[in-house]
Amino acid sequence: MNNNVYIKSTSSYLPNNPIENDRMEDYIGKIEGKPSRVKNLVLRQNGITSRYYALTTNQEITHTSAMLASEAIKKLFQDLHMLSNVELVTTATSIPDQILPSHASMVHGLLPETKNIEIFSTSGVCLTSLQALKIAYLSIASGDKKNAVCCASELVSAALLSKHYDAEYERCHNIGENPYFGFEKDFLRFMLSDGAGAVLMDNTPNETGDTLKIEWIDMESNANTLPACMIAGADFNEDGSITTWKSYNSHEISDKSVFTVKQDIRLLKKHIINLWVNHIEKVLKKHKVKAEDINYIIPHVSSMFFYKELLKEIENRNIDLKENKWFTNLTSVGNMGSASIFVALDELFKSGKLKKANNILLLVPESGRFSYGTALLTVI
């Protein structure tokens, strides 16, 4: 690769007003009209105090995922006419607004200031953010493109509405006995929220102000050895395999809540942190990076429970990534899946804390089928 790749600006778009914990079910609804039995436990464990929904209290959608993405992209530019210079748009999302056409097509359709350019969609869960970032990075590094916009967006609240769940989803057992058991039924309804984050990338840095140089992006999948852990549009079988929505009739799809997001919590407990730290150790060694040289670490975590578990495992392995270097805004903006890493980066980039030559490590796990990604940025 001949060209350096730089992040010249960052942005985030959080829809409507922040929603405090006691207002959540006003927006996503109550299953069978009853308050959730696990809500308070899940919120105590995840530590989130506010989040954003692209919803009204009538459970009406105010923004599509494509709209969230386009709003974040527009905030990258002081003048929207500058969008006409963009050569590539890469997008990430866990649950697009539609199956066809692509998410990138719908985002591009909301950016009339752009030209007939190349677009790219990534498919998956949280790691789609770094996948989209790497496509843009490689396109610029190779000389194929001079610049690119990369955006991750999530409209997940619409999939969490009470109308999509039946009363069985409320029957949780062993609440409070084990932190993981409290997650098993409707925990995801109180874990996920909406938003978008974007970055503007170029083969030249800013003339004034800070720029982030992308040193490398590294990812790995464990799907060759492990089954799916988080699914949507499918259902789990007893043997751990999944059955796709294509195998069900319309009544079965409704009865089984096939399109709701589900997670095998026991599988998550067994693997998510251990494999994540394995990956971190591997990429730091591969790229000859000393942990003590890292100035800031942005871990994408779904809850402060996993934040603590990750920190504990890193400390147990004597990896010098001290907590005083960690940065997260999870508790105030919520878990936005693929968008979270860019929204956190945007806040840190604009915080005034960064100094020239600071190194920033981005850490992103994906529990879909246990994939992990890491990126190293340098402030110049």
Set out the residue ranges of the language-model regions.
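Short acidic, glycine/serine/threonine-rich loops at helix termini
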Residues: 19, 100-102, 133-134, 159-165, ...
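Conserved beta-ketoacyl condensing-enzyme motif
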Residues: 7, 57-125, 289-308
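Acyl-CoA/ACP chain-elongation machinery
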Residues: 144-167, 222-231, 304
